[in-house]
Amino acid sequence: MPKKIIVPVGTSKPIAPFSPGTLADGVVYVSGTLPFDKDNNVVHVGDASAQTRHVLETIKSVIETAGGTMEDVTMNHIFITDWANYQAVNTVYAEYFPGDKPARYCIQCGLVKPDALVEIATVAHIGK
């Protein structure tokens, strides 16, 4: 099955050579998603909860554009800049995954823009 590039309306233009999402063989691969507005400015500076919500809404948009739902998510890769934000990220994250939880990991690291506190990359199996 050929791959399909997924670019939801209103998403920011990638700041590097990648697509927001790729659909191949019933699997949606969502690139690392940062709390950016359509002009690649960091939103909700200093607020890990609001940044996490923005990131997850963007991911949701990519998955829905591909024909899936957040219930189709099977794996999340979470990157945070400070463990002090871990609980805030988890609280918002739990709202998006109220039932069975996808596999995931979370690491602390630097991100591409200093005001970004969280980045999430996602895999979803939307079936055939």
Curated annotation (Swiss-Prot):
<dbReference type="InterPro" id="IPR006175">
    <property type="entry name" value="YjgF/YER057c/UK114"/>
</dbReference>
<dbReference type="GO" id="GO:0019740">
    <property type="term" value="P:nitrogen utilization"/>
</dbReference>
<comment type="similarity">
    <text>Belongs to the RutC family.</text>
</comment>
<comment type="function">
    <text>Involved in pyrimidine catabolism. Catalyzes the deamination of 3-aminoacrylate to malonic semialdehyde, a reaction that can also occur spontaneously. RutC may facilitate the reaction and modulate the metabolic fitness, rather than catalyzing essential functions.</text>
</comment>
<dbReference type="InterPro" id="IPR019898">
    <property type="entry name" value="RutC"/>
</dbReference>
<dbReference type="InterPro" id="IPR035959">
    <property type="entry name" value="RutC-like_sf"/>
</dbReference>
<protein>
    <recommendedName>
        <fullName>3-aminoacrylate deaminase RutC</fullName>
        <ecNumber>3.5.-.-</ecNumber>
    </recommendedName>
</protein>
<keyword id="KW-0378">Hydrolase</keyword>
<dbReference type="Pfam" id="PF01042">
    <property type="entry name" value="Ribonuc_L-PSP"/>
</dbReference>
<dbReference type="GO" id="GO:0019239">
    <property type="term" value="F:deaminase activity"/>
</dbReference>
<dbReference type="GO" id="GO:0006212">
    <property type="term" value="P:uracil catabolic process"/>
</dbReference>
<dbReference type="GO" id="GO:0005829">
    <property type="term" value="C:cytosol"/>
</dbReference>
